[in-house]
UniProtKB/Swiss-Prot annotation:
It comes from Chaetomium thermophilum (strain DSM 1495 / CBS 144.50 / IMI 039719). The chain crosses the membrane at residues 68-88, 96-116, 127-147. Pfam families: Ig-like_POM152, Ig-like_Pom152_1, Ig-like_Pom152_9, Ig_Pom152, TMD_POM152. Residues 25-35 have a biased composition (Polar residues). Functions as a component of the nuclear pore complex (NPC). NPC components, collectively referred to as nucleoporins (NUPs), can play the role of both NPC structural components and of docking or interaction partners for transiently associated nuclear transport factors. POM152 is important for the de novo assembly of NPCs. GO terms for biological process: mRNA transport; nuclear pore organization; protein import into nucleus. Signal peptide: none annotated. This is Nucleoporin POM152. The lineage of its organism: Eukaryota, Fungi, Dikarya, Ascomycota, Pezizomycotina.
Amino acid sequence: MSDAPAVGAFPQTPVAARRGPARPSDSTTSTTIKRTSPLPLAPQAGRQATNISPVIPLHILDAPTQRFYAFAFYLALTAWKLYDWTQVLEEDTESFLLFLKWIAIDCVFLFGLPELRIPWLELSQPFVMVAFAIHAMFDWILMFNIGFPWQSWVIGLLKVFYDREIAISEHNVKLSSILQNSSLIMGRQIINILPEGSAILNPELQPFCLGGDRKTANIPIFFNSTIPVEVELIRTDFETGQQESIKLSKSQLRDIERRAKRESQDGDTVQSIVQFDFPVKKTGAYRLGRVLDEYKLEVQRRNPLTFVVSCPKAWVGPALSAHRCVGDLSDLSMMVEGTPPLKIKYSRMINGKDHSFHFQSLQPEGFVSPLSGLRSNNWGYDEDDISWARAQKVPVGLNESMHSSGDWQYSIDEVQDGFGNIIKYDSLADDPDGKPKPKHLTQSFVVKKRPVIRLEGCDLRHPLKVAKGKSKNLPVSYGLSGGSREDSTYQIAWQFSPIDTLTESGDHGDVVTIGTYTAKNNRDRPTISAPGLYTLKSVSASQCEGEIQEPSSCLLLNPLEPRLSLRHEEIPDTCAGNSIGLRVDLDLIGTPPFIVRYDVISNGERRSERVSIPGLRYQLDLVPRIAGHHKYIFTHVGDSIYDGQKLSGPEYVLEQDVKPAAAALIQHSTGKMSSCLGDQVTVDILLLGDPPFTLEWELIHDGKRKQFKVPNIQENSYQIKTAPLTTGGEYTLGLTSVQDKRGCRNFLQEELKISVRRQSPRAAFGQVDGKRKILAVEGSSVKLPLRLTGEGPWKVYYANLHDGSPDKPKVQEKIIKSDNGFLEVRGRGAFAITDVWDSQCHGVVDPKASRFDVDWFPRPELSVALTHGVSKTETGFQLQDVCEGDVSGFEVALKGTPPFTVEYEVRHHPLQGSSSLSKKKIEGVVGKEAIQADTSKAGTYTYKFTALEDDLYSSNRGFQPIIVKQNVNRKPTASFVKPGQTFKYCKSEQDNEDGIPITLTGVPPFFLEVEIKHQSAAVPEIYRTPAIDSHSYELKIPRHHLRLGTQHIRIRDIRDGSGCHSTSGILSGPSVQVQLFEAPTIYPLETRTDYCVGERISYTLSGQAPFEVWYTFNGVELKAKSPNTNFRRIAESPGEFTITSVSDKASECRAPVSITKTIHPLPAVRISKGKSVRVDIHEGGEVDILFEFFGTPPFEFTYTRSTNARKGQKSQVLETRHDISHEHSKVIKASQEGTYEVVAIKDKYCSFSTQAVVGLEGGKKDKTKKLKVY
């Protein structure tokens, strides 16, 4: 028999024994295959027969039959699997048990099939593994009800073989045989909720300002998921409060639309945030008004005010003059304009060195603004009154002493308003290559040194002597303060009194004239010629008044012309012997030294001689060397002022033909002495010879001689005591002659020059800034300027009239070495000069300038302003208690010399833990400063002001710390003890029912506010608890605040006994769920009692599945089980159908009911004219859904809302609703997204439902909501 199978037959089953080559007898009918190169036969020794046979022998069941049975068994398993899948679809659920079941069955089948060793089904192990994985995946898709693309085709194919449901009689009936009429229910309404659109103006509340270079301000408007077609802004004017409506132009709206489409990820739906910068050119408060989207619906918007204010600016007020002198005040004002409180930064550059200063919290007196941080609420303001945002002008005065010369420049660098708008003006120090600042931002001064003038080489003791008719420069020494001697022009003025009008004390008399002179340079001097007293009164240079230093007075004298008188006698060799020469007495009038010229003619020879005479008297011994006739002719006499005056007359000619004694000496080493005005002079005289002596002497003053003779002097020493010298000037005391016992009178030439002061030493206080009063920093030494005349050093006696007894103040002595010296004192009071001595004479004190008042600059003072919320306590001040995070503060008043520097400590004592300390410093120039209180953490804050400095005082001596305290209460908190837990309650309240436990922190009593959000409600409901007196509480919400189903409970607000509260933003946290159940009941999805044959009678069960339902049909009582909340039966025959009772798993009770249905013939309904209509709305909008009924009213219908089908996704049924209409049409308003379709319709007698079809064609179902079927 041939081994080749017949055509069309199964291949021949291989036999294990037939492994070797075919024998010739076995292949007689086979086709011979010719080989060009036949293979050699395998060795016989290598042949081994294998014994592999099927488990079921082939002689019992051949191989094809075994393969057929295996394939049939696989098809049966597949059909069973598809049946289980249809049950999953019918129940719209998932089954993990079915998945495990089919995983096990497929595993046994696939791994057991190869073990049967059926020919051609001997599957390899890898193939079985891959096949099992594919089956497991297929089981997962089916049993977990996961949609797949060809699912509907499979369902349709299955419906051909299986389309049966349970009827009222509890038998399966084929639905398609009863109901196959899709035209009865037509149409659907698709509502698409557009993304929630919103618009917000300036969400970050950025500050904007207009002014200067900022002509426009671009305010950002953010549009979220919307394309606006109309945008309106409301502008409120700061000045008038009137509102103005501004609308975006069409071009601007088109720009927004282009941006939205460019940013959108979906071409049909806007999902992005679009920013549009709206330019404004007017100041005011802006907010969004009306915003409409492309569907003419109003877009949700937030309306915070955006303030566009005038940009802050500052300028320097005009100064009367750009010139200043050292010691002058700057007298400068700056004006700051903007929305208070303002800040300004300015720099002061002195000779290229920069100094920066800050002024803060600048605002008008009494100005109140929410920007000042002095309110206790969270930056609240009245939108009806925004006048505080208008620009205000605040002057800032600078009045500081300009202590150094050079170029001073004040420059404004930066200004900032209360909203944080900053205008910077670049300074030359920051940008040397930049443009200079405008003139209104700077003020430059040229501070010049003050001139200093004094007389040099002339005073009352050393007058100027000038010949009559001649002039001389007033010896002015000119310079500038600081010791420099810059060349400059200057003007001086002086007082002049003629010499004959001076008082006895040498001061100016009644006749006083004023002289002025403008010097071209510092070497130029005025010329004077009139004799008298010159006293400097003022000096000025470059518009700066200068200082007059001592000596300031000069006396100009015209001395007498020199005159000479001669007396002569012969010189005997003994008291009474022959003459050996002439002794000539020269008596001179004039100003020594003198030069006397004479000619000598001896024995016919003539020669000229010259003698220098230092005084007014001189004895010239003319002793010729040779005997004879000698003639002496005196020709000229001159002094230090006048040149030689010619002498003529016989009295100046002496002739002689040529033939010791008593003496007297003046006991003085130098021959010169000084005396005080009005004092007596005592001169010691040494007499030589034999007493008794007769002494002749004379006193010469001002050209007048007064001779004296003292006889009978018995001692060899004698004191000449003059009368008081009441007239100042030069006196000459000369000894004229002396005679001793022998009677010989001898001529004497001894002289003593006595210089008598023309004025007594004088002491007075100088002036500081034109007055004898000064303010100084407390504790510092003060140098009081003195003006002294006389010969130094001086002893100045002074007293502080405020020190000691008023009648006898304590007198102190001070030695002053300079006539323009200083009296250094270290206390304050009224200092008076009581007496003065110079190096020789007692002086006088100028009564008009004998007193100088010294007082301290007031030390800076700090006090806390007792405004609202600030109270005085024994230890300091107490601020009103605030809550954690609130804004609070207080004001401090400052007195002194600005700018001020205040240092203070902030110590925080928390409710628990250790305290913390921080140090802060503020600088200010105005009299009030706002201190921002720290309320970031709960506890007690202590503000201790430890140091206060102003422009004068940098020490804290005498400053008493000020303490301000404030209690910051912690914000209360509330939280669920079991967050995230679900609490189940029945609709009717039960006894001993547990509440929702809540833990609270804070100060009792508490007032709690919770938010109840039902999943089907658009707006949450608010429930407020009564007062809670403990920190733990069980929340029991009344039933009228709850709805059936699940609701989320969230704590929204809590307020405690201290007045503090926390909002949802702070209390955001886990919520709890509350599920409210009713007792198990059953409700018909339709209220009608008449049905038509072929309809499903559907009920909704409330409670917890599974349910048991008892009912009667045509007098027969039946019991049915429902694994879910849906209970339905097919009305396959007419009759009375009555539900008698129902029970569920949760209640475990049987609730009696009586629901009777009468089965009757099918109504029709069309939704949206029988078409599929799509409408796009915004959330919160509504759509009218039109239902048209055909049948006998009234109509009851059930419709579903499903998710809208999207590409690659199946829609899900979200909810099922039923309604009633007594007309042939009905409009229902819908606001939720989804596809609305009628699944059941009922008229007066009949009803029709397509839910079974929907359930099979709707794709993937919602796993949380059971589909309600009829």
